[in-house]
A protein has these predicted regions:
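Soluble "head" domains of membrane/secretory-pathway proteins
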Residues: 1-176
Length: 176
């Protein structure tokens, strides 16, 4: 996991480094492919969170059970364990098929740049999306800040004051 500055907005982001210079990255039917090889995925249960505005922008999460969940209800997402070619295994979340995010062209990572993806794949505006379209696009080396090792604080709400939305079970947890 890397902390980096968004190439356009300058805001700090945390995403997983998926592609190094020269790598070819593609999503085919919701499965990540690196250099032509499908990344191993195995089902790992369901991720559950409250359905409501999240983060400073107050965006509503996408849920696998969108049709049946209402404000304050339970948002469910399929959880998978994904194992990258370097042997690192981490959780990813899936809420269903999106042609823009789950079936992409091949991205060839340019020299001096990196390809980033969020683990909450269907709620992540990452390198699969161009900077002109509001995405991260490729991230230049000089925008990398460092490595993220732990979750210091986690909330499903819009404000730090909404203590009832705090996810205490994630405080100080290591990042996979």
């Amino acid at each position: 996991m890397a902390v980096f500055r968004h190439p356009v907005s300058g805001e700090d982001y945390i995403k997983r480094v998926i592609g190094l210079p020269g790598d070819r990255i593609q999503m085919i039917d919701s499965v990540l492919h690196i250099n032509g090889e499908a990344v191993e995925m195995e089902p790992a249960g369901t991720f559950v969170e409250p359905y409501g505005p999240q983060g400073p922008q107050g965006r509503m999460p996408r849920c696998f059970n969108d049709a049946t969940v209402g404000l304050g209800g339970t948002c469910e997402k399929e959880r998978y364990l994904e194992t990258l070619p370097n042997g690192v295994t981490h959780s990813v979340l899936n809420v269903g098929y999106s042609s823009r995010a789950d079936d992409t062209a091949v991205f060839t990572v340019p020299e001096g740049e990196y390809f980033m993806m969020g683990d909450n794949r269907d709620n992540s505006t990452d390198s699969r999306f161009s900077q002109a379209g509001g995405g991260v696009g490729f991230v230049p080396y000089e925008n990398l800040i460092g490595r993220a090792n732990r979750v210091i604080f986690s909330s499903a709400g819009r404000s730090l004051l909404f203590f009832w939305d705090w996810r205490g079970d994630r405080f100080l947890e290591p990042i996979e």
